[in-house]
Structures are given as structure tokens and as C-alpha cells.
A protein has these predicted regions:
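Generic structural signal for small/hydrophobic residues in well-ordered secondary structure
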Residues: 4-5, 38, 73, 97, ...
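Short, well-structured N-terminal submotif of metal-dependent ribonuclease cores
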Residues: 1-30, 40-53, 126
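Active-site neighborhoods of divalent-metal-dependent phosphate/nucleic-acid chemistry enzymes
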Residues: 61-107
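Nucleotide phosphate-binding site architecture
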Residues: 8-9, 36-39, 113, 121
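Short, structured coil segments at secondary-structure junctions
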Residues: 24, 58, 115-116
Length: 126
């Protein structure tokens, strides 16, 4: 399972459903894009340390961008940006899921609905 940025944000904010899911399904994967988005949202070094600790405890694997992911993401942006405003980060995360054959757990289904290749698993924080 590839975990989208929003699910980890919910976890860091103390959301019970996110906590239950991530704590009971360790060894998931995240895109390096997700990691960078999370780091950009940190307000201080303590939050960054908490994120790193959580990822270590979960034994989460960070998937780095390669040529296949880049190529798929470029295709998604070319095909869907003008009509549906597919953003670069979402295209890269979707391409990572597709390239690795992983379902994508996200609460932001609307970000990925136009990309038919992605197996989106809906996360409901409430």
C-alpha cells in the first residue's frame, strides 16, 4: 500500500482512524514526494523528529523517483493538467503507485479520479 500525504498529516494531527490504520498496517510505502510535502509542512525540528520517528517505527519504505515514475507522471500531467488541473506532486505520487503496482490510500480521491490507472483506496478521517 502506498500512503498519500494527507493520511500521514491526519495521523500527525492525532486523528484516531489514521492512527489505527497506520499502526496496524506497518511496512507501508510512501513516495519521496509525500516525504518532502510532509517536511515542508513541519513547523519546527520537534515535528520533523516526530515524523522521522514515526516512519522508522512503522518501517515505512520511501520510494524514490526513477525514469518510469517520471515518464508516467509526465504523461498524466500532459493528458490531464489543462482539463482537470492535475498537479505535479499528485501526478508523481500516482505514477509511483502505478509503477509499483500498489493501491493508493488517500482521503483526496478527487486529486486522482481522472487517472484511471491508479487503484485508489478511500481513507475517511471522520
Amino acid at each position: 500500500m502506498l500512503i498519500d500525504t494527507d493520511v500521514i498529516i491526519w495521523y500527525m494531527r492525532g486523528n484516531e482512524k489514521a492512527r489505527d490504520y497506520l499502526d496496524s498496517n506497518p511496512r507501508f510505502r510512501i513516495s519521496v514526494i509525500t516525504y518532502m510535502e510532509l517536511v515542508q509542512g513541519m513547523r519546527n525540528k520537534q515535528e520533523l523528529s516526530a515524523l522521522r520517528r514515526a516512519l522508522r517505527n512503522w518501517k515505512a519504505e520511501i520510494i524514490y523517483i526513477n525514469e518510469e515514475i517520471s515518464s508516467k507522471a509526465m504523461f498524466y500531467v500532459e493528458q490531464h493538467y489543462l482539463s482537470h488541473s492535475v498537479h505535479l506532486a499528485d501526478a508523481l505520487i500516482a505514477a509511483t503507485a502505478v509503477s509499483y503496482g500498489l493501491p493508493l490510500l488517500t482521503g483526496n480521491e478527487k486529486h486522482y479520479k481522472i487517472i484511471k490507472d491508479v487503484d485508489v483506496q478511500k481513507f475517511e478521517p471522520k
